[in-house]
Regions:
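Active-site beta->alpha loop and helix N-cap motifs at the rims of alpha/beta catalytic domains
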Residues: 1-139, 144, 152
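Catalytic alpha/beta core domains of metabolic enzymes, predominantly
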Residues: 119-128, 134-215
């Protein structure tokens, strides 16, 4: 079953002037974007600066966002980490906080993608897991040919590589979501499942139109 179809937002984590997380403002942002047509909310993805948050703050952000948006809109939690053990712990925390799905990026240079994603999937307790291909933060990323061998339902691709995106859409049987706003007009018409975008924090309607081929 498809996690969602269309455009989702890679949510910003809003802060108070002293640097503490502003849970209320972050939740309000999520609720407002859900009301403007977002089909999924990604909390604590790379746009949400998870490396700056404590484990408790990450859990609190997920819980606040889940409580702020309608139940039919999936809340996806970012749980990528340098080791499988840490990623599994973050995943378990996110599920406990109410996450409906998980987005995990592998460690840089990871030679054991299968073991890493198996640990994340086990901690997700049956919730869907998306692999995150973003070689700028975690090189070399997830090879297209590896995707079908992993316990994931889809991939978010933020590489910005149009050829790779088309290869994922045509060769990989799971769902392909682009993380690149520049590829929105390609992803939708080519048959991609959707997008998870930072740009949707400020221009959700334009992102929706672009994915639909109207941008």
């Amino acid at each position: 079953m498809q996690l969602y179809n269309g455009v989702g937002v890679a949510l910003l984590t809003l802060l108070h002037s002293d640097g503490d997380v502003d849970l209320g403002a972050t939740a309000d942002l999520a609720a407002g974007l859900a009301g403007r047509g977002m089909q999924a909310i990604l909390a604590c993805g790379t746009t949400g600066e998870p490396a700056m948050l404590t484990v408790d703050e990450r859990r609190d952000v997920v819980a606040a966002v889940r409580g702020a948006v309608p139940a039919h809109i999936p809340v996806i939690a970012g749980t990528g980490a340098p080791t499988a053990e840490v990623a599994a712990g973050l995943t378990a925390d996110a599920i406990e906080a109410g996450a409906d799905a998980i987005l995990a990026w592998p460690p840089a240079g990871s030679a054991d993608l299968a073991g890493y994603f198996a640990a994340v999937a086990a901690a997700a307790q049956g919730r869907p897991v998306l692999a995150y291909h973003f070689p700028k933060i975690s090189a070399p990323g997830v090879p297209v040919e590896a995707l079908a061998t992993l316990p994931v339902v889809g991939v978010k691709d933020s590489s910005g590589d149009p050829n790779r995106l088309l290869e994922e859409i045509t060769r990989y049987p799971g769902d392909t979501y682009t993380g690149s706003s520049a590829l929105l007009t390609l992803c939708g018409p080519a048959g991609g499942a959707g997008a998870l975008l930072a740009a949707a924090n400020v221009e959700p309607e334009l992102c929706i139109a672009a994915f639909a081929g109207d941008g």
